[in-house]
Amino acid sequence: MTSPVGLGMPEGPAAVLAPRRKTRQLQVGSVGVGSDFPVSVQSMCTTKTHDVNATLQQIAELTASGCDIVRVACPRQEDADALATIAKKSQIPVIADIHFQPRYIFAAIEAGCSAVRVNPGNIKEFDGRVKEVAKAAGDAGIPIRIGVNAGSLDPRLMQKYGKATPEALVESALWEAGLFEEHGFGDIKISVKHNDPVIMVEAYRQLAAQCDYPLHLGVTEAGPAFQGTIKSAVAFGALLAEGIGDTIRVSLSAPPAEEIKVGTQILQSLNLRPRKLEIVSCPSCGRAQVDVYTLADEVTAGLEGMEIPLRVAVMGCVVNGPGEAREADLGVASGNGKGQIFVKGKVIKTVPEAQIVETLIEEAMRIAEEMEGDSTTGSPVVTVS
């Protein structure tokens, strides 16, 4: 008897994700960072930090979007002078981002920031100031993030490796961490960012194998919204699926709140965050008998802000439509100018095409009310197809 052909599929169900890599635990203000805590989502303000009102307004918007920790730039003395007010009034922990001038590190610590990010590649004579920084941060009880970036790597390492290789990024980070450890300071988080997701992933893999510091994931200078989303999703997905990564920041040339939406969705897609509204929709084809794109967009807009985990399916034809709709909490299979509305796999009504969106939104709201009053809520999803 001929043996079956192997198709490379697992013989049994495989674990969705590897276990989280074990790390030391840190506190960034009220947010725990490390393997004992959920992966947190960060962003960075685009305002001038010395414009306190604008910065606090943007932090409020980020907080409303689900941001856990926010970073602010501190390139000038007037920015350093604003840190105390911002740190005090922010609803979420504030990290000061320091480049070039070491004196701003001490200003940020004195101002009450929850952590400080330092770039060892461009801070003047940084190695010689580590002892002072370690003492100041230790006395204040705040962590330091060593943020190595391919675009500002130490010239000595550029000369050694020729370019920003994974090995160069890792060596820079671990060298600086070692200096802090020599002075008795171990509340350290590390990032090794590169704009190439492949190099970035390899750098983090090497780093994860050589230390137990919590790791902040980021693809630096990822680009405009679409390109940056793809780069970050590819890199973060690879690492988080291996259990690597404790905080993330999706870097986009877009409003900061968009970074939070993308980052949160990445975590939800990996089941690292509870799912909320999920809309599943088909890509459409010649079989579609309705405008699936418009239908999906209108349903999404109508349910924006829904916090209940709900899966909604919007399907454009009878091939996959009924099956997908039955698998969702709520769905529609469209065709011939009408739509069959499914709830929990059962057809509850058929409505004219013009009433599909209105009906789906009404049913979603009704289901949401029921789920809010039900302590045994599962994790429903919305699928548009």
Curated annotation (Swiss-Prot):
Which is a Pfam family this sequence falls into? GcpE
Name one molecular function that GO assigns to this entry: iron ion binding
EC number of this enzyme: 1.17.7.3
Question: Which EC main class describes this enzyme?
Answer: oxidoreductase
User: Which cofactors go with this protein?
Assistant: [4Fe-4S] cluster
GO annotations under biological process? isopentenyl diphosphate biosynthetic process, methylerythritol 4-phosphate pathway; terpenoid biosynthetic process
Which Gene3D superfamilies does the annotation name? Answer: Dihydropteroate synthase-like, Sulfite Reductase Hemoprotein, domain 1
Q: Which keywords, in A-to-Z order, does the entry hold?
A: 4Fe-4S, Iron, Iron-sulfur, Isoprene biosynthesis, Metal-binding, Oxidoreductase
Q: Pathway membership of this protein?
A: Isoprenoid biosynthesis; isopentenyl diphosphate biosynthesis via DXP pathway; isopentenyl diphosphate from 1-deoxy-D-xylulose 5-phosphate: step 5/6
Which domain of life does this protein belong to? Bacteria
Cofactor detail note: Binds 1 [4Fe-4S] cluster.
| Reactions mediated catalytically | (2E)-4-hydroxy-3-methylbut-2-enyl diphosphate + oxidized [flavodoxin] + H2O + 2 H(+) = 2-C-methyl-D-erythritol 2,4-cyclic diphosphate + reduced [flavodoxin]
Q: Where does [4Fe-4S] cluster bind?
A: 282, 285, 317, 324
The question of whether Ligase is a record keyword is answered with: no
Purpose:
Converts 2C-methyl-D-erythritol 2,4-cyclodiphosphate (ME-2,4cPP) into 1-hydroxy-2-methyl-2-(E)-butenyl 4-diphosphate.
Q: Which family does it belong to?
A: Belongs to the IspG family.
Name-wise, this protein is 4-hydroxy-3-methylbut-2-en-1-yl diphosphate synthase (flavodoxin)
Q: Which organism is it from?
A: Rhodococcus opacus (strain B4)
